[in-house]
């Protein structure tokens, strides 16, 4: 059981010149046990800050975060994090990187069991046969997949994922999206997922939180039943309506903010449709 509660959470960063920058303002939300919740919004709106606070890496200036009614005071074995960029120990092989993570959370496994668990999750993310390679021998996308495999192998109750698929090619992104849905179906883990990709959020999530100006602007409960079919979802009028509404939130935000940082087109599939002509877009194709 892993229910998450954010109660009136605010957070500030202080730079080297001791200037204070607000990152979150009075954020409240409840994520139920077993829910997949995506957080979307323009760059700088506070998405990653929420994840770092949920992970216990930062403490809120005010308010509190509760997991199963207990106040979060730091990191914990009930949570694991996938960062935007891979976080592997360069002096360890890929297998040893996974085993290191597994041993932090699962005790009393034999050497053979540890190796089998590492190999199982590497195969799940399409990296069979790289166990004895070092991170420097893999591409950036492969390293990120290895980091995702390590997080999944740790088997925590809560997965916190900060744009985990951004550096991964379109084919493997689809593979990993479906893997996450399989894990959700089989284990009922609670997943909090930060993404810039509206289509990805709609395909994966039970709810989508749209952030704006350091707050949660919209909490959108999705009506799509599980298991989901990409083809059926893309053909759904309800899907198209919700997608249009979410994209309009981005453009409403853009018209009010001059310093918006747009998602770079090159970071997504070239098959992704632009919303209108040459305007920047935020969504990618699902396949």
Ranges and model annotations:
Residues 110-130, 182:
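Conserved ABC ATPase "signature" region
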Residues 134-138, 142:
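Conserved ABC ATPase signature
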Residues 55:
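Helix-to-loop junction immediately C-terminal to a conserved catalytic motif
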